[in-house]
Amino acid sequence: MKLTRKMRIKNALGLHARPATVIAKLLQGTSSAVSFTYRRETINAKSIMSILMLAATRNSLITVNVDGTDAHETMERIFQAFENKFGE
């Protein structure tokens, strides 16, 4: 199943090293393909370096795409991470 959702970055420093690591670790156990799109650039969200290269700042809208058998669960986990400011 393929799901798409827009999420806003709420933490002060945007998608820097700590949030990128949180996201990559969160996605380690998922079988779904996960990508983020920001400013017409789409990246593999399981890659810390790719997330960092987006250079997404606070209040940026990220389009999250999840495609796979565990898409609902994976999307919910990503949403919670964004809502909780990646634990910051």
Which ranges hold each PLM region?
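Intrinsic-disorder/low-complexity, polar/charged segments enriched in Ser/Thr/Lys/Arg/Asp/Glu/Gln
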Residues: 2-6, 61
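C-terminal structural segments of small proteins and small subunits
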Residues: 53-88
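Long, contiguous binding/interaction regions
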Residues: 3, 29, 73-77
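Compact, glycine-rich, soluble single-domain proteins
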Residues: 8-49, 54-57
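A broad "ordered helical/assembly scaffold" signature
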Residues: 2-3, 19, 84-86
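Secondary-structure boundary/capping motif
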Residues: 1-2, 42
